[in-house]
């Protein structure tokens, strides 16, 4: 005697065992099958001061090479220079065949074939674009033009601009709901995120940001939540991805909160947030928002992206010229890979190289990996609990670009980064860059010059020491942080 119900249940169970697991990693939907990590995958990082894209094989955690989109200083000062400047933002197509790379200084989006690493097209948009991403159907590419007040909408095939969506001033980043219905655009200049209908490009929702500086936004694969970071006040906010788009949670994450992304594994779905001022990645559950881990990763973590199966998450270390790989089950760093200068956005593209070794059109790291690193601490002490100010000196020929991830100062106060004639900060100060701290008492500070030769000079009479002093360039006050030997 046959039992139709039992037979059906057994058939269903066997079928479910034969299918791949449906877990869904960002930016795809939760219903999308996981893609096991393999040597066909690539991790890309946009490197702001070497003007390169590093290409890493996650199966071996080794750098395959770099795609050079531009030259360092002083070559890019020429009025005849045609390369890209400040390579910064990045997204990829849903078929995983194309990455879109944003260069802030040259107002461009460069489209690169993942199989060959060849540039397919370059589109020039408005002033200081920040990020780009394809709609889930691949028909459009949205580019946040942060130096203005609109999103440039490009055709997903020709890459030409077809329309603009007016948004609050300074759009920081965009991401889409996994079903492709909504685009979420936060602002870096105004305290407002907008929700846009992808079908007709109309704004259908408004979300109040606790501060005006949002650099990054991400949507959970289940389509229920949107998380965005607030770099100036060190917070991360979560809102309902569906109408009425209300705020669900605000988390105090830490100074220089940079990017957020998600990984789903056997333990659940987790948000990973890079905290640049603490040199950490913090991990939160998305169901109850509890913090489950704090991961030390290295200097100034910035961009972050999960593997296609959620087993790993990769982090760009802006002031360490490196890529950190994290095992998401143990929440431990399992690899640190040297890459180019000051990595910003990071993307992980499963199956980016369908055949071959994927080394076409790549160059060795070379000068893109040359930099020096220093530390500044309060009163020259080792200090416990607070991360020190990290300083990177990125080689640009005979000079360097200095970038300091400054932490531990009073909020909303003027300071100056300077050179002191004595190691204890006494004597004459030579100002390099004046800055104002944000509400979290932190700042990103830049300068340029032959600084490495000065602060590492073996001749005592010519050597100078990096310090941070209160006040302005015209009237520097007391020294509050000094260069240390560690």
Map each language-model feature to its residues.
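Bacterial N-terminal signal peptides that target proteins for export
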Residues: 1-9
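Predominantly soluble domains enriched in secretory-pathway, periplasmic, or organellar proteins
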Residues: 13-386, 397, 427-431, 436-440, ...
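Structural beta-strand segments of beta-rich domains
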Residues: 389, 398-404
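Short, flexible loop/turn segments at beta-strand junctions in immunoglobulin-like
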Residues: 406-409
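Short beta-strand segments enriched for Tyr within beta-sheet-rich domains
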Residues: 413-419
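Acidic glycine-/aspartate-rich tracts in secreted/extracellular proteins
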Residues: 423-425
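Short, aromatic- and glycine-rich surface loops/edge beta-strands on solvent-exposed regions
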Residues: 457-471
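Short beta-strand elements
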Residues: 475-486
């Amino acid at each position: 005697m046959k039992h139709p119900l039992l037979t059906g249940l057994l058939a269903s169970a066997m079928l479910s065992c034969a299918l791949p697991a449906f877990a869904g990693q960002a930016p795809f939907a939760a219903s999308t099958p996981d893609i096991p990590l393999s040597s066909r995958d690539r991790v890309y990082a946009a490197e702001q001061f070497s003007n390169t894209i590093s290409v890493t094989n996650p199966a071996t955690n080794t750098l395959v090479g770099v795609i050079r989109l531009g030259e360092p200083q002083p070559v890019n000062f020429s009025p005849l220079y045609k390369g890209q400047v400040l390579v910064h933002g990045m997204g990829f197509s849903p078929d995983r065949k194309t990455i879109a790379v944003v260069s802030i200084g040259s107002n461009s989006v460069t489209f690169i074939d993942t199989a060959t690493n060849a540039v397919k097209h370059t589109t020039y948009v408005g002033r200081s674009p920040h990020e780009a991403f394809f709609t889930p159907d691949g028909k459009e590419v949205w580019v946040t033009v942060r130096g203005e007040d609109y999103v440039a909408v490009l055709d997903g095939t020709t890459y030409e601009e077809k329309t603009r969506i007016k948004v609050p001033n300074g759009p920081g980043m965009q991401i889409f709901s996994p079903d492709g219905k909504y685009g979420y655009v936060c602002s870096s200049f105004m305290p407002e995120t907008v929700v846009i209908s992808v079908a007709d490009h109309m704004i259908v929702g408004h979300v109040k940001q606790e501060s005006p500086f949002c650099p990054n936004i991400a949507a959970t694969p289940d389509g229920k939540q949107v998380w965005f970071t607030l770099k100036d006040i060190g917070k991360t906010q979560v809102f309902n991805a569906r109408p009425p788009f209300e705020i669900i949670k605000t988390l105090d994450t830490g100074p220089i909160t940079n990017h957020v992304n998600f990984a789903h594994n056997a333990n659940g779905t987790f948000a990973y947030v890079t905290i640049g001022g603490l040199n950490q990645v913090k991990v939160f559950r998305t169901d109850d928002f509890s913090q489950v881990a704090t991961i030390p990763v290295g200097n100034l973590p910035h961009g972050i992206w999960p593997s296609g199966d959620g087993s790993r998450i990769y982090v760009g270390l802006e002031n360490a010229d490196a890529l950190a790989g994290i095992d998401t089950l143990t929440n431990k760093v399992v690899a640190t890979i040297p890459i180019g200068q000051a990595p910003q956005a990071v993307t992980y593209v499963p199956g980016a190289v369908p055949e071959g070794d994927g080394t076409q059109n790549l160059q060795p790291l070379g000068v893109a990996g040359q930099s020096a690193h220093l530390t500044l601490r309060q009163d020259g002490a080792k200090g416990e609990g607070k991360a020190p100010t990290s300083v990177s000196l990125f080689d640009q020929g005979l000079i360097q670009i200095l970038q300091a991830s400054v932490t531990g100062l009073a909020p909303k106060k003027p300071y100056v980064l300077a050179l002191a004639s004595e190691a204890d900060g006494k004597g004459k100060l030579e100002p390099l860059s004046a800055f104002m701290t944000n509400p979290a008492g932190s700042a990103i500070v830049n300068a340029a010059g032959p600084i490495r030769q000065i602060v590492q000079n073996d001749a005592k009479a010519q050597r100078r020491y990096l310090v941070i002093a209160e006040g302005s360039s015209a009237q520097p006050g007391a020294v509050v942080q000094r260069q240390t030997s560690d």
